[in-house]
Design a protein with these regions (language model features):
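Short loop/turn segments that flank or connect secondary-structure elements
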Residues: 1-174
Length: 174
């Protein structure tokens, strides 16, 4: 059971989440566009932070709710371009205080989380796994995450624009 105490209530939502469960920065494949890679490389000076890997959950390959996502992100061999993970499943950029990348450098899918989305737009409901029960009374998720809907919509547009800059991936499931 999740309980908000006076001590935990002063923490950001992501920190409260991390006290209760594995987070979105752990055990999650983070898809990156070439634009994401350029931003991260320019910030870190590194180019060894991504790879092509099959999804942890094989059901991911069966999704058909966003044909554009499938067409531009999943290769014929079932792999996707994702951030590297440490041996325990943590994102390579997850540090003791959270993400080590500044918000404007983080992958676009990370900036959009905890919202699900498809090419048509951003869902009003949070993604499965986001512990909304840890929201402070009277606070909304966007407010708690310090997210602006207009900014999130811009990231969403940018994500799909960057994906479409590449040749579509020929995939048997489309």
């Amino acid at each position: 059971m999740f309980e908000i105490t006076p001590e935990s209530g002063s923490l950001p939502l992501c920190a409260r989440c991390a006290r209760h469960q594995r987070t979105c920065c752990q055990d999650t494949d983070v898809f990156v566009t070439w634009g994401d890679i350029d931003r991260i490389q320019n910030h870190t000076g590194r180019n060894d932070f991504h790879e092509y890997r099959a999804p942890v959950n094989p059901d991911y390959l069966a999704q058909d709710d966003d044909p554009t996502w499938v067409r531009y992100s999943i290769r014929p061999d079932g792999t996707r371009r994702v951030l590297l993970q440490r041996s325990g499943g943590d994102c390579l950029f997850l540090g003791m205080q959270g993400c080590e990348l500044p918000p404007d450098v983080r992958p676009l899918v990370c900036r959009l989380y905890p919202y699900d989305f498809d090419e048509a737009g951003i869902s009003e409901a949070p993604a499965q796994g986001c512990p909304v029960q840890l929201l402070l009374p009277g606070r909304q998720l966007m407010e708690e995450m310090d997210m602006d809907l207009a900014e999130a919509r811009q990231w969403h547009r940018q994500l799909y624009e960057e994906m479409k800059l590449e040749e579509p991936v020929p995939c048997a499931s489309v």
